[in-house]
């Protein structure tokens, strides 16, 4: 009842609009006295196009009538007497009106409730941005549904007019035949006597004059009916075009844009069910009007009357055929896109769908769809209607599929499950363009027969641009091409033109979307992260994001030219960050344990005033996909330390958490979180003791300079010494202590050279898998790789 209470508070034009909703089809008194009952019924749960829901609609009609009768019976007194009669009359009237078509009652009440809600929302003027967005969307959908209701009513009106025209014309033909019969009777008068002939002739002449006058008037009436019907069809087609433009050029294009952004990690494009229901309603109404126009043409051919109608009907017939053609060709879409980075000799899938397949009898003769790969230039020629028949740029295996109709969902679609690109033919490259910048597209084409083969349409649709690679090493640069295209493609572009430059804030949005999707995290790029990226890209030291908002980024800056002073592009560095996080550090990033986007100087500034043992994790500048540890520890030599970066290869040997656990002098995660509180849940569990008599070795992260410090300390309890066993390491029998050689461990820049020792470590790890008594003394590992039982293998 809350809805009706709000509706009663409407004023001015809104109140007048609400009053127009009611009439003999549904009196406003019924809405008022049964407000609570009406608002509690499941009107939206009924599918108006499903005959099986008729029974539920009948129950609602019966319930409405019973509620009215009950309300009438409870009226007492003088005023109640009149209301009792009125409500009883309404109950009878509604029963008679909707008894044969209960679904129309549901349609009527839904229309009323939708418009009431719209008027109330407009009056309230929602103030929140989210509310405005949702309201705007619901408003648009409501407007579409209202237009469909209007189209249904005008189509029903022209159907009634057509029937009236047909009945009038049939009666006219009967009377015309009567006129011919009278003329035949005149010819027979010669056989009668003069007196009888004169008497009969006078009567026949009077009858003929009267009939011819009537025929002349009726001919004009018929012509007027025909013109009025053609004019109504013209108006209907104008409304149909407008509705179709909203659905195909606005709603469907927006869905395709969402699908494109989903390729960059944006939110899913959403279901096609609502769009399909709209397209199917369009198809039904268009087809009904086309059939009406054809019947009108048949009536004109049956009884030709000179006038403008033939030309008008020919025009509306051509118009409605164009409308059907646009609907069928535009609703042949790719529901599931092929991969946009497409590797040769690799299986891939795609799904195409016809959104009107269940309404125009297309599914009665299931069409076959063919997929071919074409170049960007071939796609341009195709859209210009140039002759490109049978031209392609490669060979796709398993590229033909028959569309299937799914009765339960009402969808007509073709699922390509096992396609494979056997070969690709590349075009001549332009300038500095690499093979990973060359764009192709998968062309899907078919032929649809509509309405029992009355109309046949050749349909084609292009996939989003794809970049073809032959080796996994090309994947990263190909992804950059796809990212740029998906993010910055403009509506209605020539294939596959994109801006060469975009504003930095636009690129930030695309990077953040891709980052969250790849890392599968809600923790996106912060303002500080974006400042760091801007500093890196523009080689600028400003720490204010606003300073970069007006700067443009070219494609060359993004992934063609190396960053100043480095041997990689901006995208290659950023992609390496995403890859290492995705493969190894998603939980640590989500926990906020990885600061990441800070350079060495910024790390120094953050740590300099922190207690010894405070550390942070940042992405390496020198190594793509590298993560380095920076920590504070005062010593005579220095007070800030940086380890040589770890990469994906290193983390596949020993996890980040275990490496941090090995280094006991790392105590606090910046700014002040205890290390074990953050990382202990990710430590590898301690292995059970061996049962075969052998002690199992463990790999342990060691920083040799700190091990030296530990040995020099002679057992002191300083927290920076690497004295405690790793959380993942069991105490083991002591080994001989080898002297450490730190000469190449910390470089001049204060970073540990992991690459120089990792191969040796792997070799020793392999040796340690053998029984200890079988190792020849000649296989002793190099100096500096073993520590005591408190240490471990580096």
Curated annotation (Swiss-Prot):
Chief location category: cytoplasm
Any one cellular-component term (Gene Ontology)? RNA polymerase II transcription regulator complex
> What is the stated purpose of this protein?
Carries out a dual function: signal transduction and activation of transcription. Mediates cellular responses to the cytokine KITLG/SCF and other growth factors. Mediates cellular responses to ERBB4. May mediate cellular responses to activated FGFR1, FGFR2, FGFR3 and FGFR4. Binds to the GAS element and activates PRL-induced transcription. Regulates the expression of milk proteins during lactation.
InterPro entries the UniProt entry points to: p53-like_TF_DNA-bd_sf, SH2, SH2_dom_sf, STAT, STAT5_CCD, STAT5a/5b_DBD, STAT_linker, STAT_N_sf
- What's any GO biological process attached to this entry? B cell differentiation
Keywords, sorted A to Z = Activator, Cytoplasm, DNA-binding, Lactation, Nucleus, Phosphoprotein, SH2 domain, Transcription, Transcription regulation, Ubl conjugation
Region Disordered: list its residue ranges.
Answer: 773-794
Protein's name according to its UniProt entry: Signal transducer and activator of transcription 5A
Which residues, renumbered to this chain, carry the PTM Phosphoserine?
A: 128, 193, 780
- List the top taxonomic levels of the source: Eukaryota, Metazoa, Chordata, Craniata, Vertebrata
Localization annotation: Cytoplasm; Nucleus
Task: Give the record's family classification.
Answer: Belongs to the transcription factor STAT family.
Subunit structure comment from the entry: Forms a homodimer or a heterodimer with a related family member. Binds NR3C1. Interacts with NCOA1 and SOCS7. Interacts with ERBB4. Interacts with EBF4. Interacts with CD69.
Q: How is it modified after translation?
A: Tyrosine phosphorylated in response to KITLG/SCF, IL2, IL3, IL7, IL15, CSF2/GMCSF, GH1, PRL, EPO and THPO. Activated KIT promotes phosphorylation on tyrosine residues and subsequent translocation to the nucleus. Tyrosine phosphorylated in response to constitutively activated FGFR1, FGFR2, FGFR3 and FGFR4. Tyrosine phosphorylation is required for DNA-binding activity and dimerization. Serine phosphorylation is also required for maximal transcriptional activity. ISGylated.
Q: Which residues carry this modification: Phosphotyrosine?
A: 90, 682, 694
Q: Which residues form the SH2 domain?
A: 589-686
GO MF annotations for this entry?
DNA-binding transcription activator activity, RNA polymerase II-specific; DNA-binding transcription factor activity; DNA-binding transcription factor activity, RNA polymerase II-specific; DNA-binding transcription factor binding; phosphate ion binding; RNA polymerase II cis-regulatory region sequence-specific DNA binding
Query: Could you tell me which CDD domains the record lists for this protein?
Result: SH2_STAT5a (cd10421), STAT5_CCD (cd16855), STAT5_DBD (cd16849)
């Amino acid at each position: 009842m809350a809805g009706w209470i709000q509706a009663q508070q409407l004023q001015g034009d809104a109140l007048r609009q609400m009053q127009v909703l009611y009439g003999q089809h549904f009196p406003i008194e019924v809405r008022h006295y049964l407000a609570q009952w009406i608002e509690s019924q499941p009107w939206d749960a009924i599918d108006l196009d499903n005959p099986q829901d008729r029974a539920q609609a009948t129950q609602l009609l019966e319930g409405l009538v019973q509620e009215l009768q009950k309300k009438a019976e409870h009226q007492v007194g003088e005023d109640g007497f009149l209301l009792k009669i009125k409500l009883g009359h309404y109950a009878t009237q509604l029963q008679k009106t909707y008894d044969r078509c209960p679904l129309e009652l549901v349609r009527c009440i839904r229309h009323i409730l939708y418009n009431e809600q719209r008027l109330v929302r407009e009056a309230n003027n929602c103030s929140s941005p989210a509310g405005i967005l949702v309201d705007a969307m619901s408003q648009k959908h409501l407007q579409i549904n209202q237009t469909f209701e209007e189209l249904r009513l005008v189509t029903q009106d022209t159907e009634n007019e057509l029937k009236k025209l047909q009945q009038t014309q049939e009666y006219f033909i009967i009377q015309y035949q009567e006129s011919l019969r009278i003329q035949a009777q005149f010819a027979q008068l010669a056989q009668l006597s003069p007196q009888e002939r004169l008497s009969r002739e006078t009567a026949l002449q009077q009858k003929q004059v009267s009939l011819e006058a009537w025929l002349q008037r009726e001919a004009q009436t018929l012509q007027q009916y025909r013109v009025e019907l053609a004019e109504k069809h013209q108006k209907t087609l104008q409304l149909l075009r407008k509705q179709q433009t909203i659905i195909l050029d606005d709603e469907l294009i927006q869905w395709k844009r969402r699908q494109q952004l989903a390729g960059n990690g944006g939110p899913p494009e959403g279901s096609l069910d609502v769009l399909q229901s709209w397209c199917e309603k369009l198809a039904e109404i268009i087809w009904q009007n086309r059939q009406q126009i054809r019947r009108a043409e048949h009536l004109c051919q049956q009884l030709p009357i000179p006038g403008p109608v033939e030309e008008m009907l020919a025009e509306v017939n051509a118009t409605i055929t164009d409308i059907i053609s646009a609907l069928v060709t535009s609703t042949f879409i790719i529901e599931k896109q092929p991969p946009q980075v497409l590797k040769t000799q690799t299986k891939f899938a795609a799904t195409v769908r016809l959104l009107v397949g269940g309404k125009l009898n297309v599914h009665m003769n299931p069409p076959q769809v063919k997929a071919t790969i074409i170049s960007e230039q071939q796609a341009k020629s195709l859209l210009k209607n140039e002759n490109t028949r049978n031209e392609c740029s490669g060979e796709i295996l398993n590229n033909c599929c028959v569309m299937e109709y799914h009765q339960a969902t009402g969808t007509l679609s073709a699922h390509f499950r096992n396609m494979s690109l056997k070969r690709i033919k590349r075009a001549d490259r332009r300038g500095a363009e690499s093979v990973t910048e060359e764009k192709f597209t998968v062309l899907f084409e078919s032929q649809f027969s509509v309405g029992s083969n009355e109309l046949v349409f050749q349909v084609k649709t292009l996939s989003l641009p794809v970049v073809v690679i032959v080796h996994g090493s090309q994947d990263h640069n190909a992804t950059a091409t796809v990212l740029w295209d998906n993010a910055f493609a403009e509506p209605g572009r020539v294939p596959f033109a994109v801006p060469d430059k975009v504003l930095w804030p636009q690129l930030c949005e695309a990077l953040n979307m891709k980052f969250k999707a790849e890392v599968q995290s809600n923790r996106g790029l912060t303002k500080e992260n974006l400042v760091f990226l801007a500093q890196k890209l523009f080689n600028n030291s400003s720490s204010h994001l606003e300073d970069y908002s007006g700067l443009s980024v070219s494609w060359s800056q993004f992934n063609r030219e190396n960053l100043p002073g480095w041997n990689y592009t901006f995208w290659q560095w950023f992609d390496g960050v995403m890859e290492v996080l995705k493969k190894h550090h998603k939980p640590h990033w989500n926990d906020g344990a990885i600061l990441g986007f800070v350079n060495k100087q910024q790390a120094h500034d953050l740590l300099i005033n922190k207690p010894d043992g405070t550390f942070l994790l940042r992405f390496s500048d020198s190594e793509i996909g590298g993560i380095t540890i920076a920590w504070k520890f005062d010593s005579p030599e220095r007070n800030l330390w940086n380890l040589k970066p770890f990469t994906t290869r290193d983390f596949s040997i020993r996890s980040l958490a275990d490496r941090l656990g090995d280094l006991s002098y790392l105590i606090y995660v910046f700014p002040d979180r205890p290390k074990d509180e953050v990382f202990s849940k990710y430590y590898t569990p301690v292995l059970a003791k061996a049962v075969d008599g052998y002690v199992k070795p463990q790999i342990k992260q060691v920083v040799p300079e700190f091990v030296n410090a530990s040995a020099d300390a002679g057992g002191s309890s300083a927290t920076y010494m690497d004295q405690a066993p790793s959380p993942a390491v069991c105490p083991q029998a002591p080994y001989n202590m080898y002297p450490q050689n730190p000469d190449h461990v910390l470089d001049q820049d204060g970073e540990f050279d992991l690459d120089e020792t990792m191969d040796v470590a792997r070799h020793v790890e392999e040796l340690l898998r053998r029984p200890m008594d079988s190792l020849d003394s000649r296989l002793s590992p190099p100096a500096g790789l073993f520590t005591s039982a408190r240490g471990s293998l580096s």
